[in-house]
Each structure stands twice: as structure tokens, then as C-alpha cells.
């Protein structure tokens, strides 16, 4: 239910899928009244913002978002329980990579044909999908679409936070350090989740604030990391 409430607040309007996909049956059985109430809220949001959006595009990108996240959530659950390098977590990666390659074809074709569309046109979830699929691609593809994302941020069509995450991903791959502290990994010795090295770490929260990201201590808690800012 929390995920549905989050999607509603982000103007998720794939109402048809929410009401017909059997994957949501477990929530209906758990609390039919609460599910119906949330669906009505989502329907209302859809009716209010639909005239502003391209529903074909938003529904298309929403479906890609679900495919991108479904296996990753299963992987994250296994990683939290057994560790990132465990067989229980690693078994998901072949299928994740396959999904990523298919989603990348779809999203790059979309961007090449229609540009980096704003949340006003494709919804918050659709807009996030464009970033997530590029973020989950290879470095060459990330480099190729980085200028397009930078331009989209300047035009208020994309989130500065998304740009920060992509820049960090590229920086870690190239240099082994990051700028905004968004990238984490499992320490091979302690098996704990830690941040990749952060360049000029004393000023990381100032840089994060400029990109509209929460303080690193708050972000770290999402991964079970206790972070104390450097004085």
C-alpha cells in the first residue's frame, strides 16, 4: 500500500494497469476498502492531469518502469538478507541484465525520437524511467546521453538529482571516486554497505543541496549506513 500511495503522490496515472493487473490482487485481499480508496484517488489525479499529458507515452514508460524495478526489488530484498555477493542475490542478475538491454532499446528509441520529456508530459514515473534505464546502461551509453540529460535539467525537464546520480556513476567507473555520494557497494572485508570514496568529502552536502538531494546522512540510512559529516 505504501508503494501505491507513493505512486499516487507522484501522479502515477496508469489507472488501467492498477485495476486489471492480477499482481495487485494480494493487496485487494489484504484490505479491499483501502485499495479501493487509493484507486479512487489515483483516478481523480488521472482525470485532473490527463489533459496535460500524453497518455500513450506515459503508460508506455510506466510499463518499462515496472519491468526495470520488479527484479531489482527482489534482488535488493535478497541482498539485504544475505549480502550483495550471496548466491541468493546474484541469481537475479542474468535476468536483470536481459531486461535492462531490452528496456534500453525502448528508451533510447523514445529519447531519439521524442527527446527527454518532462513529468508534465509523461508523468513523474515516466520521467524517472528515462533516467533509470540510462543509469542502468553501460558507460558508453551513459556518456552519450549525459549531454541530453544536462540540457533537460536546464530546461526543467529532468531532476538535478538524477543528473548527480549519473555523474557519480560515470565518475566511479572512470576514476574510482564520486562527487555527490550517491554510489554504494559492499565492502569485501566487512560485508557491510559503504559509500564509494567521495572527492572533497567535506563539501559533499553543499554539492548535494545544489542538486536538490537530501543530506548524505539521511541518504545513507536508506542503505543502513550511519554517516557522520566531516567537520
Language-model features: locations:
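Beta-strand-rich cores of mature extracytoplasmic or soluble domains
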Residues: 14, 23-26, 176-190
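Extended, non-catalytic structural segments that build the interaction scaffolds
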Residues: 89-92, 189-196
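Solvent-exposed, polar/charged alpha-helical surfaces in well-ordered, non-transmembrane soluble domains
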Residues: 25, 105-109, 147, 202-209
